């Protein structure tokens, strides 16, 4: 059981108000929360909570600025990500980087990118509900440590897990939702844009809305 000193209690009361994520109170989760990024990443890299650990090459923990005000969340690693240990490095990742650059964002400077699941599902299938649930604790901890102001869900799976289970991404992408003190938005997954290039203008409109919102509430992202 995690024991807090008085200083930590004050900090955790603040987090309870701001970080009550994924349909769970912070106090219910506190015994599983990490205080340091290094310990979180170390344990995640050794995770064997579901069967995806048996087929992975690398755990794909995430990439970017650990103090980012904007957090992007995808569904899970693909083949290239599994081989390189970094999210969104294949063709979809290259497209994502171009879209980020268009609104002055950079995965290595002013945002963080993570996934719902940290290990590649075989044949790039959607992660199963039980796999998502086994892995979501790592993401909760990342969110609690990063403390972003905006979360952007890349694709249907992430949006349904993070924003709401009945999310209709084709109709509700680009709309901001407030959840537990955080602004959240979903946009189309880069892989979906590669399959259907006609949707690229819609996704770019989402990014322009994101840029406007960053300018409104994120004082450090562009500075």
Residue ranges and their predicted role:
Residues 9, 14-19:
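Charged/polar low-complexity intrinsically disordered segments
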């Amino acid at each position: 059981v995690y024991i807090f000193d008085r200083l930590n209690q004050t900090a955790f009361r603040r987090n309870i108000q701001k970080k009550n994520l994924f349909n769970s109170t912070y106090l219910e989760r506190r015994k599983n929360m990490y205080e340091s990024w290094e310990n979180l990443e170390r344990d995640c890299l050794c995770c064997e909570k579901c069967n995806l650990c048996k087929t992975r090459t690398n755990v794909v923990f995430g990439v970017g600025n650990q103090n980012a005000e904007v957090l992007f969340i995808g569904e899970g690693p693909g083949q290239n990500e599994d081989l390189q240990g970094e999210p969104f490095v294949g063709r979809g990742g290259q497209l994502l980087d171009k879209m980020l650059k268009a609104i002055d964002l950079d995965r290595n400077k002013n945002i963080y990118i993570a996934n719902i699941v940290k290990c590649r599902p075989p044949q790039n299938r959607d992660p199963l509900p039980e796999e998502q649930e086994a892995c979501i604790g790592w993401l909760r901890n990342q969110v609690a440590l990063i403390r972003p102001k905006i979360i952007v869900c890349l694709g249907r799976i992430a949006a349904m897990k993070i924003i709401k289970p009945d999310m209709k991404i084709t109709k509700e992408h680009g709309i901001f939702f407030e959840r537990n003190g955080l602004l959240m938005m979903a946009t189309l997954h880069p892989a979906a844009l590669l399959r259907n290039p006609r949707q690229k203008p819609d996704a770019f409109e989402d990014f322009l809305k994101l840029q406007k919102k960053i300018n409104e509430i994120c004082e450090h992202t562009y500075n």
